């Protein structure tokens, strides 16, 4: 379902599930007024130049925490192959190219009419020029047009992304769900990097991103040698060696 304008593709999908009681729906919008990312943050989209998309699943994976990893792998695989770019996955749910953000992923579990549904939101910068981004993110954001030097057909790209996302999400219940983490590591731009992590209590730690555990939590070796497990939070990658 391709719509001209919505408040949020996640909210529109939620309304459709509630009214139609079916989940074989993909919502894409040319314009999204109130897109959101993780922990309620606003997600900035450029009308008619972005992909703002939400998909629903009525079977929860064995490990719901791995959903964003599966979707990240799917998007990276499609974009890397189609556009010959090196897409990196930044923990936990961002798509990066050349140290700039190309897109992000949001997974939410909602209880609707006595049933649990997984809602997956994808935001992707497609046909923006640098000056289309707000000034405060211009240095940190990129788009497929900037990277490839040509405009991209958004509808054709959605047709490539949706089946690949379905494939990887559904695979979480068909094979060992932890295989997706091995795939994620192949695209990771996080592991081995010097990072600063903001913890849920608003404190910070600094160190090296070592690995993921079986639930997708990030293992960090702090400067004092201690290993810390980060299950939720934000990280900043510092592109320089540790002392």
Predicted regions and their residues:
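Long, positively charged amphipathic alpha-helical accessory segments at protein N-termini or as interdomain linkers
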Residues: 61-62, 69-87, 97-243
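A generic fold-level signal
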Residues: 21-22, 48, 90, 114, ...
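N-terminal lobe of the biotin/lipoate ligase/transferase fold
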Residues: 1-81, 85, 103, 227-228, ...
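Conserved active-site carboxylates
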Residues: 94
